[in-house]
Amino acid sequence: LLIEQENCLGGMWTSGLLSPLFDAHNKTGIMKELVDDLTAKNAWGGFWQISYIQEYMKHFLEEKALSAGVTLLYETKYAGVQVKDGTVEGVFVRNVEGETYYKGTIIIDATGDAHLASDAGAQWVMGDENGNCQSMTLMFLVGGIPEKYKDGFVMYQVLEEAYAKGIRHFTLEVR
């Protein structure tokens, strides 16, 4: 059973539009399979040749989970954990049907912010040794891009030149 708070798998990869997969070409296993599948569907590449189309990623992840026999429970939020004698026995979840309890032998916290682990009493740390966390990333989709910029190479060169000059704010005039 996989409990997902969104209406698709992938978390920030899909719902958060966080599409760059840095160093993906040097990976094997499921990551290579993922890149190969997205490439075959013309859904891989983008700005730095490390991005993908989120809708295809959603499909890939769901297909993999279902083919492995995973039951998916979408739009369901973690609501609490049942711990007995230091062992997590199950989780409470909440969705439009109300609150439900699921007992399990192996429970993995994939909340992204360790809610389940924290509620179960696990020790955790946040940030680096000084408590600093990675800054937020703003991701967005842009349409109507002129053809010459679609492969990303020309735009990449413009950005590289701007950074080399130390320019952080610039305007790109599209003609």
Task: State where each predicted segment sits.
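Conserved N-terminal/central alpha/beta ligand/cofactor-binding core
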Residues: 4-84, 134-135
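Glycine-rich phosphate-binding loop of nucleotide-binding enzymes
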Residues: 89, 110-111, 115
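Short, solvent-exposed loop/turn segments at the edges of secondary structure
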Residues: 86, 111, 133-137
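Conserved beta-strand positions in the Rossmann-like core of class I SAM-dependent methyltransferases
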Residues: 1
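Short, hydrophobic/aromatic-rich segments at coil-to-beta transitions
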Residues: 85-91
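Core beta-strand elements of the Rossmann-like FAD/NAD(P) dinucleotide-binding domain
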Residues: 95-106, 110
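Rossmann-like dinucleotide-binding core of oxidoreductases
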Residues: 116-175
